[in-house]
């Protein structure tokens, strides 16, 4: 509901749905994420959304994944046990090393010339995660630093993943 509130405050027309016909009308589908990768993928399968999201990505219709939603965009995750993901962005999700949780504010270092992301340089964003993306460099748009460097924004075409929570990051989000 934080994402919905944030988007409505910015005057976006927001609909929450798992109906493919409703999602197809959307300019952008946002995959939020709180919870565990295996149960989230099970929910997507149970709601018959996996095939739809894969097809939407093939057609280059925008999808934004936030936190766990970003992780679901990948080929799979080692959270609890290996679970296959949507496979929209090559790479996997692995546990953070010590410390095992990253909760707090960090800046983004951009690796690509993305104008929207470039506007976010030197601003802090809110993170709350215990897993990170591990994959080819060409899909890493921004990195952040917490003991070690990790990807904080990934993307392939019109599929974008944000490890941070823009809706909890105040004005920069």
What is each PLM-predicted segment?
Residues 132-173:
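C-terminal and late-domain segments of enzyme folds
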């Amino acid at each position: 509901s934080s994402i919905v509130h944030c988007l409505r405050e910015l005057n976006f027309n927001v609909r929450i749905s798992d109906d493919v016909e409703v999602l197809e009308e959307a300019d952008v589908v946002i995959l939020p994420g709180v919870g565990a990768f295996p149960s989230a993928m099970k929910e997507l399968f149970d709601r018959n959304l996996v095939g739809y999201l894969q097809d939407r990505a093939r057609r280059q219709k925008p999808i934004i994944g936030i936190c766990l939603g970003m992780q679901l965009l990948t080929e799979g995750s080692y959270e609890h046990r290996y679970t296959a993901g949507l496979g929209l962005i090559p790479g996997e999700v692995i546990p953070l090393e010590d410390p095992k949780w990253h909760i707090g504010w960090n800046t983004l270092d951009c690796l690509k010339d993305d104008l929207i992301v470039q506007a976010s340089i030197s601003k802090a964003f809110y993170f709350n995660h215990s897993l990170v993306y591990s994959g080819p460099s060409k899909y890493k748009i921004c990195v952040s630093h917490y003991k070690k460097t990790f990807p904080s924004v990934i993307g392939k075409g019109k599929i974008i993943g944000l490890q941070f929570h823009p809706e909890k990051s105040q004005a920069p989000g």
